[in-house]
Amino acid sequence: MAFRITRNRAWSHGAPGGFDAVVSLQGARAAQSEISTWPGYAVTPLYHLAPVASACGIDHVFYKDEASRFGLGSFKALGGAYAVARLLQRRVQDRLGRLVAISELARGDHRAITQCVTVVSATDGNHGRSVAAGAAWFGCRCVILVHADVSDRRAEAIEALGADVIRLTGTYDDSVRAAARLSRQPGWSLVADTSTAGDEEACIDVMHGYTVMVAEAFDQLSQSLHGLPTHIFTQGGVGGMAAAVCAHSRQLFGEHAPIQVVVEPERADCLFQSAIAGAPTRATGDLKTIMAGLSCGEVSQLAWRVLERGTEFFMTIPDRAAVDAMRLLADAARSGTRIIAGESGGAGLAGLIEASRDPDARAELRLDRESRVLVFGTEGATDPVLYDALVPAR
């Protein structure tokens, strides 16, 4: 199947109200202030892909590469670990009756309290890795649920961080519900990146963590003198990352915010279908996609509160487009610099490339020779064996 695009009829120009209850500037700045102090923090690269821009018939393509984030391979390193830190901070505060700094948790000052906490989450791979890292860094137990389609390599990477990994049959959405049930045990807490069930506070912390990536990208563009992008193509999934990008850009720039296009696999299109229906709606496909990190059938309710009026366009792409983008990025002659991107990592770029080739899509998305497009390379080769199978060595 070819790509599909739909315009969100509920989209509102400017800065719609209600964003602050989900992703606020105050929360974003708190996350940026905290995460930037962590050992291993470094601003990830922003690459200017001039050959890709030329091939797409636009002015610039900027690729924010999250493969090196905290050594965990994806932007998710910013969300789950931060949410674990914030949750433990609240638990210690409840016991001591005073606010404690996250740096105290990292030093192990309150290990007698935190070691009694078990955090649990479901994952397609990357979020669970971040939650497991946060548990290791800040001193609690971690249980991660993976579904049938999560590769052994991704599950092993989570176990290597000290988490207990439980493999279930069924889909990602089934594992989300199972994690919510487990979290009802005494001493257990859910750290989810979707709010279909469970602790909204942790889900909000996850999205605030993601804004660190967005703020870095805007700062890098400002320093490069290229200015604000005209468009941002973001990955879909349950919507958490897309909502963080949407809210942060709309709050900063209002009616001058970039046009946002959310990109999903054609067989895992819950956000696309929700935009058509005007309400959270299940994906129509069977969720079988090479883009494992985007294999989600149900929308995050919290994320949808931002996206339902904040994002103008939603699109779906076939697996073939994602693999083509991986191969293009790996070929320095075609991309301008060699970049290693996982199956979901280049999905935003894949959406841009597909749309740029179609005159009707270009017109609908207002893509032209003056367009400056930002995309997020959300993951590196988090399953190296699969990457090598999909991207032939050159």
Predicted feature locations:
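PLP-dependent amino-acid enzyme catalytic core
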Residues: M1-R394
